[in-house]
Amino acid sequence: IVVPRTMEDLDLQKVAGTWHSMAMAASDISLLDSETAPLRVYIQELRPTPQDNLEIVLRKWEDGRCAEQKVLAEKTEVPAEFKINYVEENQIFLLDTDYDNYLFFCEMNADAPQQSLMCQCLARTLEVDNEVMEKFNRALKTLPVHMQLLNPTQAEEQCLI
């Protein structure tokens, strides 16, 4: 899967702080379709490190409860692209952000034969912004694989501690 890169530059310090997972999409919906699906994660916070890596604080359902995890995304030569070791070795890349309201990112597992892509729309607040959601949908259409959308914004589905 080759994904078009839309962000040339990334100011890592500006993505720091609280975020909320507003929508998720995946090339294989089984990665997201249940509470315990492997990539059904709720981003809480992004923390740039002094080495320009990115610590991702997320929540995920485990053993019937919501558990917090931290994942380190290691910088690569490409400004908006990181390597992570979550579930398997994957790449994370930022598709688009305005830093203040929204951030779109995708996680790609490039290991054949199970190549898969999962993307999320993050927002600084829990208010749904239809313009941002439309922009996320347009961004998904630029991807080389068909993405199935899931909106986990209903409170009972959000993994809250």
From Swiss-Prot:
Q: Which UniProt keywords apply?
A: Disulfide bond, Milk protein, Retinol-binding, Secreted, Transport
Q: Which organism is it from?
A: Canis lupus familiaris
InterPro entries in the record: Blactoglobulin, Calycin, Lipocalin, Lipocalin_CS, Lipocln_cytosolic_FA-bd_dom
Superkingdom field: Eukaryota
- Main location group: secreted
Q: What does the UniProt entry say about where the protein is found?
A: Secreted
Which cysteines pair up through disulfides? They are 66-159, 106-119
Q: Can you tell me which family this protein belongs to?
A: Belongs to the calycin superfamily. Lipocalin family.
Name of the protein in its database record: Beta-lactoglobulin-1
